[in-house]
Swiss-Prot record:
Keywords: Plasmid
Entry similarity comment: Belongs to the ParA family.
Electron transport recorded as keyword: no
Pfam families for the chain: AAA_31 (PF13614)
InterPro entries found in the cross-reference section: AAA_dom, DNA_Partitioning_ATPase, P-loop_NTPase
Superkingdom as given in the UniProt entry: Archaea
Descriptive protein name: Uncharacterized protein MJECL24
Length: 259
């Protein structure tokens, strides 16, 4: 079982899109996959569940994290089966309030790890979607993860924000909260050949961090935007779309390189 965080402290880089598509694609390839929505904006949960998200006010990741101790049965009751191979623990409207409550909680950085440890034998992959900020939720996610994937896009501020994320990873490792945490690689999102800027930014990223691979380049397409609006993976719209192919290749890379 492998836990992977999709994280970047810069917003708008496509974390949720990548988390959703990677999770669905791994499941489509036959792997038991759980996606955890740890973002208070709950875009992933709302995209998949729509207004049904309101039905899970007492069964979501916020409720689990707010408890001093949580039983395996409570965790299992909060898991929503999306299909035969994909499960979801949703976010909710009140998740921001839970993060504030955690400030004074005992072993606050270990909350998510303790939850995952009770159910990890049920899955091949657990994917965590994170908020674009450094807070207790992101720290929990990094402490609970084996790997982190850092999405970025072809903008100066996105590339500059990568270093903030890498610094946070080093702090987590050096503090011994999770000394084995590894950066799996970058995903370059919203790539377009119609302008020289995306190509230039991609080369800058490779030059700045030669020891961290770019494990996926996701093209900017209208199909991705349509899929986002309906909370579906891109391959459900068009399996031959360049973005569908890119996400399939990303999943294959993860399967081959993460054990």
């Amino acid at each position: 079982m492998v836990v992977i965080s999709i994280a970047n402290q810069k917003g708008g880089v496509g974390k949720t899109t990548i988390a959703l598509n990677l999770s669905f694609t791994l499941a489509e390839k036959g792997y038991d996959t759980l996606v955890i929505d740890l973002d208070p904006q709950f875009n992933l949960s709302f995209g998949i569940l729509g207004m049904k998200l309101l039905d899970y006010a007492d069964k979501n990741i916020g409720i689990l994290l707010s408890k001093n101790s949580v039983k395996k049965k409570e965790i299992e009751e909060s898991i929503i089966k999306i299909n035969d191979k994909l499960d979801l623990i949703p976010s909710h409207l009140q998740l921001s309030a839970v993060e504030k409550m955690l400030v004074n909680a005992y072993a606050r950085e270990m909350k998510l790890k303790n939850i995952i440890n009770q159910i990890k034998e049920n899955y091949d992959y657990i994917i965590i979607d994170n908020a674009p900020s450094l807070g207790l939720f992101l720290i929990n996610s990094l402490v609970a993860s084996d790997y982190i994937i850092i999405p970025c896009e072809p903008s100066y501020f996105s590339i500059a924000g990568v270093q903030l994320m890498l610094d946070t990873v080093e702090e987590i490792k050096e503090s011994n909260l999770n000394p084995k945490l590894k950066v799996l690689g970058f995903i370059f999102n919203k790539y377009s050949k119609q302008s020289k800027i995306p190509q230039k930014r991609l080369e800058q990223l490779k030059q700045l961090y030669p020891n961290i691979p770019v494990i996926g380049v996701i093209p900017r397409t209208i199909t991705v935007e349509k899929a986002e609006r309906e909370g579906k993976p891109v391959f459900k719209f068009d399996a031959n779309n360049p973005a569908s192919v890119a996400f399939s290749e990303l999943a294959e890379w993860v399967i081959e390189n993460v054990k």
